[in-house]
Amino acid sequence: MKVLITGGAGFIGSHTADRLLKEGYKVRILDSFETPVHHNSSIPEYLDDRIELMCGDVTKEHDLVGALTGVDIVYHFAAFQDYLPLFSKFVDFNVTSTARIFEIIVRDELPIKKVIVASSQSTLGEGLYLDSDGNE
């Protein structure tokens, strides 16, 4: 079985890839390898050589179609993470990309058996910073 992990070069994605490889799965990763997650915008050395790497963007349909074709299972871990208030970018990466994955699967009648979607801290944002004396 072949698995696609979006955001697979990140912390959770890379550990998921390692586990899936140990269990005998073939693994493909779609990742943008961009900052701030990847500090120098290059492919991390910790990724196993058996992983099929695709540099791409979950907000671009062409990249998603290529990544989804030929896989049986999808782990959708890709997320935009930054501390700047770029709300439209958060929504496009963290919400719209999930819908786009399902739309492509249905439209192209891809035989994908399962899609696992994980959230990230990015969905809630940073929140408000409040002074506190620690007693609240």
Regions found by a protein language model. Name each.
Residues 18, 98-99:
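Conserved active-site helix of classical SDR/Rossmann-fold NAD(P)-dependent CH-OH oxidoreductases
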Residues 6, 30, 74-78, 115-121:
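SDR active-site strand-loop-helix element
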Residues 100-136:
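Conserved Rossmann-fold NAD(P)-dependent oxidoreductase catalytic core, especially the SDR/UDP-sugar
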Residues 14-16, 39, 85-86, 126-128, ...:
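Short glycine-/acidic-enriched loop or helix-start segments at secondary-structure transitions
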Residues 55-95, 123-126:
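NAD(P)H-binding glycine-rich loop region in Rossmannoid oxidoreductase-like domains
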Residues 1-73:
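N-terminal Rossmann/SDR dinucleotide-binding element
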Residues 10, 33-34, 81-82, 97, ...:
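Alpha/beta-hydrolase active-site loop signature
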